[in-house]
Every structure is written in structure tokens, then in C-alpha cells.
Amino acid sequence: YQTKNQGCDPSEYLSQKWAFSIVDKCIVLEDDDVPSQSFFPFCKEMLDRYEHDERIAMISGFNEDEVTPDCEDSYFFTSTFAIWGWASWRRVVDKWEGDYAFLRDKQAMKRLQSLVRQRGYRKDFLPMCTEHQQSGKEYYESIFWASMLLNSGLAIMPSKNLVNNLGLSDNSTHFCGSIQTTPKAYRRIFTMKRHELEFPLKHPKYVVENVDFKERVYKINAWGHPFIKMSRSLEELFLNLRYGNFSSIFKAMARRCRKMIGRDKHA
């Protein structure tokens, strides 16, 4: 345990670096993650099966499809993932750059910018990494994402969702608002059903990305979809007005103003 309360960040980064310095592979659950029972044997089998496959960077438990319609196997591969219940190996965590060194590498940044643009990934990702680096803290989410991109890593995704996240409330660390004022598409993410996988697992024959899944996830999160993002913002505004949640409206307006003047690059 930490001897000093350092907050969510950099505590998560430090804790995970510590854990993976002791073991070669590990399952990670945060306090707001609720896994199904089959999450653990699934992770165990994947950790053993792909331990030495450098193409695979992590195993995710949260599937935004809930049940992926175009998958006949027990799992598939994707370049997008969630950290709501995951597992990985020391070989992956050892590549994490806690000092965000890639930001000072002109060639790496040029290729990252091209990759983010080509994939239609969230435009605020690299500015967010810069802001995290300037804070002097290690934010493991942006460090993990950057490492996946820089090393062309794939995630293993179960064909059915195995994890719920309970982290949406007025007092959340990462999210503001409540279920009733959250746009329907995002609300679904936090109320999604957990499933159990059947064993023995059915393994895919090829290690190839499920691009259709990635495109659905990007659409759900409005990455590269400005009109969807705008409609979600309007829906959230309407819901906050409907339920009299004026404080959230003022906070959102303040974030937008900070973004406009360059004080918050990824609001």
C-alpha cells in the first residue's frame, strides 16, 4: 500500500509498475469494476496462451458491444480497449514511458499524429499526453494508450461483456453528473449487462483486428464523429435542464471557456 495519499494519479501508475515488477502477469481491477465469474479464468487462459506473443499487449474485460454480433469465437483482437478490468504482462508494462519521452521524439510524434488522424481517434489524445507530462504526474491511462499505439499493440476482447463499471455518480473521480443526466449512448455503457463465457473457449484461427468493432466503439464515443458529439452535448444539456442540474451546466460552460482560451486542451 502507498504510505502517502497521492491521489488517483500517479497512484495507479506506481501501483501497477510495482505489481508487475513482482509478477510476470497480472489481472487488474479497480474499486468500481464488477467482473463476472468467468472473467478470471478467461484472463488466466489468455495470459498463458499469449504470454510470449509480442503482438498482444493486454486482455480487456469490458466489451462495449455487450455481445459482439460478428464474432463466432470466444474472443477477438482489437486496437481499442477499456481499462475497466484488464490483464497484461510485465513485458508490456516495462515499455511504459512514465516520463512521456515519446513527446520529445519528433519522428515518433509525426507518426503518432498520422496514426491518430488515419484511425479517426480522439483529437485531444496527444494534447492530453502533453498536459499530463507537464503536470509532473504519471497518468497511466494516457501512458498505456500511447504505448499501445507506439508498439502497434492489440488487445484481446471477449465476445461478451464481462465487467460492469459503477463509477458514474455525482461524486465520481473521472465522471461528473448522474445516470439520469447522462446521454443514452453513454448511459448504456454504465448499465450494461455482464455475461459469462462458455468453456472450453473457442480460439480464433488468425490474429487479425476486428475493424468493425473498432468503428462501432469510435461511433459510441463520438471519436471522429463531430455531429454525434454535438448531438450528445445537446442531449446532455437538455437532460441537465430537465432535472435542474444547473451546476453541471455551469461546469461544462467553464470547461468550454477554458478550452477556447487554451487553458484546457481536452475539455
State each model region's role:
Residues Y1-L29, D33-A267:
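Peripheral/terminal regions associated with large enzymatic or DNA-binding modules
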